[in-house]
From Swiss-Prot:
Belongs to the short scorpion toxin superfamily. Potassium channel inhibitor family. Alpha-KTx 06 subfamily. Expressed by the venom gland. This is Potassium channel toxin alpha-KTx 6.9. InterPro entries: Scorpion_toxin-like_sf, Scorpion_toxinS_K_inh. GO terms for cellular component: extracellular region. Inhibits Kv1.2/KCNA2 and Kv1.3/KCNA3 voltage-gated potassium channels. Disulfide bonds join 29-50, 35-55, 39-57, 45-60. It is found in: Secreted.
């Protein structure tokens, strides 16, 4: 019983700490305009925003 709980806790902790694949490439920015060109190269769309000095690229709708 105790071993199963520890294993479950380990799995949950590991999955929450792993970075997602989409955010693996970090593009630094100081304004949203700096994100348009790099995000267009990655996703093919201009949908982007600068948040916490890193670009957040959104896909095409």
């Amino acid at each position: 019983m105790n071993a199963k709980f520890i294993l479950l806790l380990l799995v949950v902790t590991t999955t929450t700490l792993l970075p997602d694949a989409k955010g693996a490439e970090i593009i630094r920015c100081s304004g949203t305009r700096e994100c348009y060109a790099p995000c267009q190269k990655l996703t093919g769309c201009l949908n982007a925003k600068c948040m916490n000095k890193a670009c957040k690229c959104y896909g095409c709708v």
